[in-house]
A protein has these predicted regions:
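N-terminal export/targeting and maturation segments
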Residues: 2-75
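Mature extracytoplasmic/lumenal regions of exported proteins
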Residues: 46-170
Length: 170
């Protein structure tokens, strides 16, 4: 009786740990989905210089709250705080300081064992996604803290996306 109770209590951890490696194998090599190559983006956007010396400004505004950062007030209309990609609500995470219509969005859903988070680089002027980064994980609720945790295919997924965002259009 005790082992069954323990399994029922920890079922999401067991399922996430068992299923995630198979899902990781399915997604291996497919983490980055390219919609526009750097050359195509340059041609369509008219930007002929490198983005090497530009920065990505973190978007700190909470949905429904007025924006207070002068950078975001000045560039209002060049970005959208919320965008939908593949039916999922993505939140603005950063904006390029030189080309404020070039935005980064993220969708993180820790409420399902079969986690599939996405990060999108989007050109709001062209109304096109440049690329999408997929992060696969098995989410579960930590029994001690009650918070969401995961078994991720790539523990460095966020820094990998950040590096890709920084270097893709250089």
């Amino acid at each position: 009786m005790f082992p069954l109770s323990l399994f029922l209590y920890l079922h999401d951890i067991f399922l996430a740990e068992i299923i995630t490696p198979f899902r990781c194998e399915m997604w291996e090599g497919k983490e980055v989905e390219v919609f526009l190559t750097p050359e195509e983006w340059r041609k369509l956007s008219g930007v002929n210089e490198s983005l090497k010396d530009t920065e990505w400004v973190y978007y700190p505004t909470i949905e429904g709250q007025p924006e207070k950062d002068p950078f975001f007030i000045k560039n209002q209309g060049l970005y959208q705080p919320v965008m939908y990609f593949n039916g999922n609500k993505h939140y603005l995470s950063s904006v390029n300081n030189k080309y404020p219509y070039l935005n980064s969005y993220s969708y993180i859903n820790p409420t399902t064992i079969f986690g599939h988070d996405t990060y999108v680089l989007y050109d709001n002027k062209l109304k096109k996604a440049v690329f999408q980064y997929h992060s696969i994980a098995g989410y579960y609720t930590d029994p001690l803290s009650g918070l969401a945790d995961n078994f991720a295919c790539n523990e460095n997924y966020f820094s990998d996306f950040y590096k890709l965002q920084q270097n893709y259009l250089h």
